[in-house]
Structure formats: C-alpha cells, structure tokens
C-alpha cells in the first residue's frame, strides 16, 4: 500500500501558496538546498542521499550559483576545491576527508570557468588574491593547475600545448 498523502498537502490553500511563487524564486530555493557546509567552506551535493560533492558536478553548478546571486557560496566552493589543487588535478569526488579520487579530465577547466564567471559578476579580479588553504592565493593555485595539466598529471591527463585539447586515459 502506498502511503497516504495528508489532506493538508493537497488542499486548495496548499496549492494556492505554491501558485503565487514565481518559477525563478522556486528555482533559487531549490538551488540553495544543494549547498552545504564542508568544514569552514561550502560545497554542492550532487544528489541526496547517494552522491556527495563531485568536483565536476559542483563546478558546473557554480554558474547557476553566480547567476542566482549566491556569490559568497560560490566563492567558498571555489576556495574549497582550489585548496585541493595538486599537480594539475582537483578531486573528482570528496569522501569525508578523502580527496584521492582525481580521475576527472575537465573539473579543473570548470574551476577556471567558475572563477571567470565570478570575477565578471563582481567586476574585477580581487577574488583571485584570496588565500587558499594550501598556502597559495587562488591565482597561484590556478596557475599551478594549468602548468600541471600542460606537463601531464600523475593519472595521465594532459593538455596538448599546440591544440590545447585535453587527453585523458579511460578511468
């Protein structure tokens, strides 16, 4: 037997309340529900309850956070993932404190895109001077990521210096 839906949830009054909410407000409310704390910063959960914070998914979602005016949250998420930058990689997934899964060929590129979107929205580049937990500025972390991608990462991801195409072995 399917669970019974309480009558109060399907009453005319319940629907009227939802009908008066714009689609934009509904989407912004839904967007905010995926942003969660991770330590002293923030992240995006890819999907409850099965998925945690996946680098690529999170960084793609940042475009919506920036456009939706969730800039402090977007900044905290960027700093979170940039703090894990290492030899051209960022985590594909963070599981608790474990960020060893780095088999993502384009999450780093989405991090660059998120930084660009945020700087454009803020009208300047001062955000790039913020300190990341790894002791570098965000700009230094981005430069390190780019250099690591061009040199080739420990898991075989590399950018061709002539075409700038990303190569990734199957993971």
Q: Model regions: which residues?
A:
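Acidic, mature catalytic/reactive cores of soluble proteins
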Residues: 1-171
